[in-house]
Amino acid sequence: MSEQEDQEAPKQFTFGTVGFDARFPNTNQTKHCFQSYIDYFRCIKAKGEDFVPCKQFWHAYQSLCPMEWVERWDEQRENGTFPAPI
């Protein structure tokens, strides 16, 4: 192998998901998904988008929630019809 080929070696992908949350011990993570979505937007509303602990909720709902749900919830938030207070 040439030196250039060594430098262009692809980076290894690391797959990660949200860790265990004792509030949601069952295998069905629907409630965890929804609660993480709500918690994220409550957190950034209270502390701002740059508040690092809010990212934990973001990672959780991005990992657990189907994107179709997130898109629908985003639309509902924009329209003021989201079913939970944020």
Curated annotation (Swiss-Prot):
GO terms for biological process: mitochondrial electron transport, cytochrome c to oxygen; proton transmembrane transport. Keywords: Disulfide bond, Membrane, Mitochondrion, Mitochondrion inner membrane. It is found in: Mitochondrion inner membrane. A motif (Cx10C motif) lies at residues 54-65. A motif (Cx9C motif) lies at residues 33-43. It holds the Pfam family COX6B. Residues 30-73 form the CHCH domain. PROSITE patterns: CHCH. It is a peripheral membrane protein. The keyword Amino-acid biosynthesis does not apply. InterPro entries: COX6B-like, CX6/COA6-like_sf, Cyt_c_oxidase_su6B. The keyword ATP-binding does not apply. Disulfide bonds join 33-65, 43-54. Gene3D superfamilies: Cytochrome c oxidase, subunit VIb (1.10.10.140). It comes from the Eukaryota. Pathway: Energy metabolism; oxidative phosphorylation. GO terms for cellular component: mitochondrial inner membrane; mitochondrion; respiratory chain complex IV. Component of the cytochrome c oxidase, the last enzyme in the mitochondrial electron transport chain which drives oxidative phosphorylation. The respiratory chain contains 3 multisubunit complexes succinate dehydrogenase (complex II, CII), ubiquinol-cytochrome c oxidoreductase (cytochrome b-c1 complex, complex III, CIII) and cytochrome c oxidase (complex IV, CIV), that cooperate to transfer electrons derived from NADH and succinate to molecular oxygen, creating an electrochemical gradient over the inner membrane that drives transmembrane transport and the ATP synthase. Belongs to the cytochrome c oxidase subunit 6B family. Component of the cytochrome c oxidase (complex IV, CIV), a multisubunit enzyme composed of a catalytic core of 3 subunits and several supernumerary subunits. The complex exists as a monomer or a dimer and forms supercomplexes (SCs) in the inner mitochondrial membrane with ubiquinol-cytochrome c oxidoreductase (cytochrome b-c1 complex, complex III, CIII). This is Cytochrome c oxidase subunit 12, mitochondrial. It comes from Schizosaccharomyces pombe (strain 972 / ATCC 24843) (Fission yeast). The lineage of its organism: Eukaryota, Fungi, Dikarya, Ascomycota, Taphrinomycotina. The gene is cox12.
